Amino acid sequence: MKRTPLYERHVALGAKMVDFAGWIMPLYYSSIFEEVMAVRKSVGVFDVSHMGEIVVEGQETVDFVNFLVTNDFSAIPEGKAMYTVMCNETGGIVDDLVVYRISHEKAIMVVNAANIEKDYEWIKVHAKNFNVEVRNVSDETALVAFQGPKSQETLQRVVDIDLEGIGYYSFQWGRLDGERVLVSRTGYTGEDGFELMMNAESAAKIWDTLVEIAGNVDGKPAGLGARDVCRLEASYLLYGQDMDESTNPFEVGLSWVVKMNKDFVGKEALLKLKEKVERKLVALELSGRRIARKGYTVLKEGKEVGKITSGNFSPTLGKSIALALVSRCVKTGDRLEVVFPGKNVEAHVVKKPFYRGSVRREA
């Protein structure tokens, strides 16, 4: 299994280590509950260095990225990032990603850990007709998320840039412990927070500083368990669970990242799919504390209407919650049943997100 540059730090902190997409990663350090609460009330520090970073560089960078993704990359200025998806020719989602516009001739695409090789090959194939160079810099890059309502005031003590001046989905280059870092106001928790991109050799030093300053405000390192709970509470999607190449953006609530005023891979298919959306991703609150697993059947009036895509117990809400891909006939407020081994459990369709935290929504 692959290790991030922070593997030794996780072991030293006593983390429970697990396999995630071929990486050995911390599931939790103390407990998932405590780590979720730290993120919600103070700050959590996450190693997300398993994510992939692919650099696109050259005169046609903006045109190329814009052709590759569904959102309008040409509309954002330098110093901004953008959430988007890449689709295949049939409209299926190849991956969801965040793209940073470094300059007119350089972009960094941050992709899911399980998809690094697939995405890299996909991007290279489509780059052949453009004046760009594509490089996979994942192994030499580290990524740490610093998330929670106290993230700005805490991080400000150790960086040389004004964090208040970094808007939502914006970034600046700065220094932390003398090391160069890209600091973006992005995250996957539903709270205000930052993600710090750096050279892999700088990661351990920076991690130690971040864990120390988090501890000063009752924050703590947080593992993949807390990350998954936080993203589900915020109704953020996970590739491979809530979407994949068998789903299109309209089915999973991502129509807002599809801009039809430009050309891109999969556009023709999506124009047709938009006219006949038969499924949708909904939020469910379940009775009791049992966790609905991916693939569990969802019933409405005894008839199957879909499947669970993600489920977990929410410590923030004190409820079992889930996302499900269901027939478009399902409406908010509907009473459904989820088929567990041995019994059916009642569930209600609620509005997304389950939880709205301190995340900044302004541009």
Swiss-Prot record:
InterPro entries: GCS_T (IPR006223), GCS_T_bac (IPR022903), GCST_C (IPR013977), GCV_T_N (IPR006222), GcvT/YgfZ/DmdA (IPR028896), GcvT/YgfZ_C (IPR029043), TrmE/GcvT_dom1 (IPR027266). This is Aminomethyltransferase. It holds the Pfam family GCV_T. It comes from the Bacteria. The glycine cleavage system catalyzes the degradation of glycine. The keyword Transferase applies. GO terms for biological process: glycine decarboxylation via glycine cleavage system. GO terms for molecular function: aminomethyltransferase activity; transaminase activity. Its EC number is 2.1.2.10. GO terms for cellular component: cytosol; glycine cleavage complex. Signal peptide: none annotated. It is an enzyme of class 2 (transferase). Keywords: Aminotransferase, Transferase. The glycine cleavage system is composed of four proteins: P, T, L and H. Belongs to the GcvT family. It catalyses: N(6)-[(R)-S(8)-aminomethyldihydrolipoyl]-L-lysyl-[protein] + (6S)-5,6,7,8-tetrahydrofolate = N(6)-[(R)-dihydrolipoyl]-L-lysyl-[protein] + (6R)-5,10-methylene-5,6,7,8-tetrahydrofolate + NH4(+).
